[in-house]
Amino acid sequence: MMDPCSVGVQLRTTNECHKTYYTRHTGFKTLQELSSNDMLLLQLRTGMTLSGNNTICFHHVKIYIDRFEDLQKSCCDPFNIHKKLAKKNLHVIDLDDATFLSAKFGRQLVPGWKLCPKCTQIINGSVDVDTEDRQKRKPESDGRTAKALRSLQFTNPGRQTEFAPETGKREKRRLTKNATAGSDRQVIPAKSKVYDSQGLLIFSGMDLCDCLDEDCLGCFYACPACGSTKCGAECRCDRKWLYEQIEIEGGEIIHNKHAG
């Protein structure tokens, strides 16, 4: 069994080290093997104090560097305005925007997080006077951008996996179990398991995220029981029910094709 990487140890998620969700290979890199840009992104996205001798496993490279943006499925909601997850028409916060907006609003925005049109409009309305000033940042060299970012005192944003499954964005999802009384869907018998011990649907073997998007790689905080980012309010392993539908920002209803 391989030892956990330094990132897993510091973030107290050693159970996730060397997983093969997003890569077929297992192993380590030392942080000095990363580019300066990747090391900076890792530092900002984890809130960790890093040194070149620290190690990162291939799984955490995927989570925090290679696929971090893809794994952000909803608006980061910096102003606490959303009652439901906003998942449409998102745009990524880049390094320059993270620097500028964090300083402007006095709250941490991490490169790779995403904003919805509503939050973008709030930001644009708040910083209109400084638009010219903001544009001047774009031509800056990577070195100056990195220096500016390093000068900011970021606190640990908290990994998505550090939160309890009932808190934060997860509680904003309105999920309907197919076992709900009066449901027009098939009711799963109380003693019948819908998911196997690995969290896969027994009848199809599918690794379906509780957001019901069949292409989703996982958009929830990691499950404290199994570590998967595809579990909603309760771990899918050996679960006896599944979600019939969810409602997302804008009132759109997504139905579970596998519930009937």
Swiss-Prot record:
Quaternary structure and interacting proteins, as annotated: Interacts with ARL14 and MYO1E.
Covalent link Glycyl lysine isopeptide (Lys-Gly) (interchain with G-Cter in SUMO2), residues: K177
Biological role: Through its interaction with ARL14 and MYO1E, may connect MHC class II-containing cytoplasmic vesicles to the actin network and hence controls the movement of these vesicles along the actin cytoskeleton in dendritic cells.
Keywords noted in UniProt: Acetylation, Cytoplasm, Isopeptide bond, Phosphoprotein, Ubl conjugation
InterPro entries on file: ARF7EP_C (IPR029264)
In-chain residues carrying the UniProt-annotated modification N-acetylmethionine: M1
Taxonomic source organism: Homo sapiens
Modified residues annotated as Phosphoserine in this record: S183
Tissue specificity note: Expressed in the immune system.
Compartments it resides in: Cytoplasm
Region (Disordered): 160-182
Highest rank taxon of the organism: Eukaryota
Protein name: ARL14 effector protein
Entry GO terms, CC: cytosol; focal adhesion; intracellular membrane-bounded organelle; nucleolus; nucleoplasm; plasma membrane
Signal sequence region: none
